[in-house]
Design a protein with these regions (language model features):
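Alpha-amylase-like alpha-glycosidases and glucanotransferases acting on alpha-linked glucans and related
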Residues: 1-55, 77-208
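Ligand-binding beta-strand-loop-alpha-helix segment within the catalytic cores
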Residues: 73
Length: 208
C-alpha cells in the first residue's frame, strides 16, 4: 500500500491499484514481496512494535490493579480497500455496504461504506473468521466493546452505489455468534460490552 501511494496518491486501496496487484496470489505480488523484502519486513516490524507497546500498557494496568485496565473497541466492519478484503475476498461482500435504515434522526439512512461479512461463508467455515476476530481483539484487555452489537442479529445491507434507503436487513446466526462470544469472553477473561444505539430490535435486547 505504501509503495502504491508513493507512486500515485489516488491509489487509496487495492481496488485502485494496477490490476496485477489486486490479487494477493498473483505472480506480481509474490515478486514484489521478494524484491522488496526489507520494506515488507519493516512494516511487519512496525506492527510488532505496536503490539508490544499495547501489551506493555495492559501489563502495566494489571500491575497497578486497575479493575478493567484497557477497554478495546471492535468496529462493525473493515475498510473496503484494506488488507482484510484484499486477503480474503470470499468472506466479504464487496458489492454491498453496511449502514442504517432511515429513521427520525436520519431520514435518508446511513451508509458507512464498509463491506459486510457473508453470513453463509462464516457458517461454512465453522465460524472460524468470527472466532479469530474475537481472539485477536480480546488479547491484552479487560473489556471489549462491540460496536453496533445488533450486527450479530442483522445488518442493513446497501447495494454498492445505492443510497441507504434502498437497503435491506440480512440476518446472521445470532444464537451461535453470541454463544461463541460468551465462550471466548470466558477464555480470555474479557468483559463484553454491546453498543446498542440506533434502531434496536427487541430480539437482540432479550438475547443480550
Amino acid at each position: 500500500h505504501a509503495g502504491h501511494v508513493q507512486q500515485d496518491p489516488l491509489r487509496w486501496g487495492w481496488p485502485a491499484w494496477p490490476k496485477a496487484y489486486q490479487d494477493i496470489s498473483s505472480p506480481e505480488v509474490t515478486a514484489f514481496c521478494t524484491e522488496q523484502a526489507d520494506e515488507v519486513s519493516f512494516y511487519l516490524w512496525l506492527q510488532w512494535l505496536a503490539y508490544c507497546q499495547f501489551a506493555e500498557c495492559w501489563h502495566t494496568s494489571q500491575h497497578d490493579a486497575m479493575p478493567i485496565g484497557l477497554y478495546r473497541d471492535l468496529a462493525v466492519g473493515v475498510a473496503e480497500g484494506g488488507s482484510e478484503t484484499w486477503c480474503d475476498r470470499e468472506l466479504y461482500c464487496l458489492k454491498a455496504s453496511v449502514g442504517a435504515p432511515p429513521d427520525i434522526l436520519g431520514p435518508l439512512g446511513q451508509n458507512w461504506g464498509l463491506p459486510p461479512m457473508d453470513p453463509h461463508i462464516i457458517v461454512a467455515r465453522a465460524y472460524e473468521p468470527f472466532i479469530e476476530l474475537l481472539r485477536a481483539n480480546m488479547q491484552n484487555c479487560g473489556a471489549l466493546r462491540i460496536d453496533h452489537v445488533m450486527s450479530v442479529l442483522r445488518l442493513w445491507w446497501i447495494p454498492y452505489g445505492e443510497t441507504a434507503d434502498h437497503g435491506a436487513y440480512v440476518q446472521y446466526p445470532v444464537d451461535d455468534l453470541l454463544s461463541i462470544m460468551a465462550l471466548e469472553s470466558q477464555r480470555h477473561r474479557c468483559m463484553v460490552i454491546g453498543e446498542d444505539l440506533g434502531t434496536v430490535p427487541v430480539e437482540i435486547v432479550g438475547k443480550l
